[in-house]
Amino acid sequence: MLETTIDFSRYSSVKIGAPLKVSVLENDNEISQEHQIIGLANNLLIAPDVKNLALLGKNYDYICDKGEWVEVGGAANASKIFNYFRANDLEGLEFLGQLPGTLGALVKMNAGMKEFEIKNVLESACVNGEWLEKEALGLDYRSSGFNGVVLRARFKKTHGFREGVLKACKSMRKSHPKLPNFGSCFKNPPNDYAGRLLEGVGLRGYCLKRVGFAKEHANFLVNLGGAEFEEALDLIELAKTRVLQEYGIHLEEEVKILR
């Protein structure tokens, strides 16, 4: 098993973190339950002393036509998958043109934009070497019900790439900030929006040391420059406390915190 050092202050999308050892996994038999897969670190906040980090290597970066479905390796990124579906006139993953991440993380969090999400197109996934049908994965709003590493997945093939869906997803992205961030900080509560709640407690544009909630959209935690893990964690906890006190609603993080 190979090992490398990754500086997460450069590698992660929010540009917060420290140089850490990361195992590079190239075969199914190298996977263990202890591994915390980082992918492209787009939706992660990583503590400076976390252990057992790993990523899937080049053997998992592939897309293959299997006749009735398309098989995608766990390390293939969203852009690569989007381009394949568009080039082959396949519908269902148009939203990946506006999302970051690798296949494994996209399945694990049932990634999506509004009503467009992974589970609508997914057929099955290979988790820790075992193929599971979609129904067994417990996919829900930005979450799943399984433990383990997604090594590959299969998607149904329906012809007819939808340019209108891509256009709608591009429009949604216009409100996203340019500063380093990890996407939505919190999941939307049932029948409400995390951004509305955060704005309601005065956190839109609010700064705490070197982190803040974006002026463009309150549900985006941004790195103002040189921020550290504890600063981001403090702001997340502050937001949860304020929203709970004002609205009686427990906000749940969409960002995955590794510590």
Curated annotation (Swiss-Prot):
Keywords: Cell cycle, Cell division, Cell shape, Cell wall biogenesis/degradation, Cytoplasm, FAD, Flavoprotein, NADP, Oxidoreductase, Peptidoglycan synthesis. Its cofactor is FAD. It is an enzyme of class 1 (oxidoreductase). It catalyses: UDP-N-acetyl-alpha-D-muramate + NADP(+) = UDP-N-acetyl-3-O-(1-carboxyvinyl)-alpha-D-glucosamine + NADPH + H(+). Its EC number is 1.3.1.98. It is found in: Cytoplasm. Pathway: Cell wall biogenesis; peptidoglycan biosynthesis. The active site is at R142, S184 (proton donor), E254. One of its GO terms (molecular function) is UDP-N-acetylmuramate dehydrogenase activity. Its main location: cytoplasm. This is UDP-N-acetylenolpyruvoylglucosamine reductase. The lineage of its organism: Bacteria, Pseudomonadati, Campylobacterota, Epsilonproteobacteria, Campylobacterales. The gene is murB.
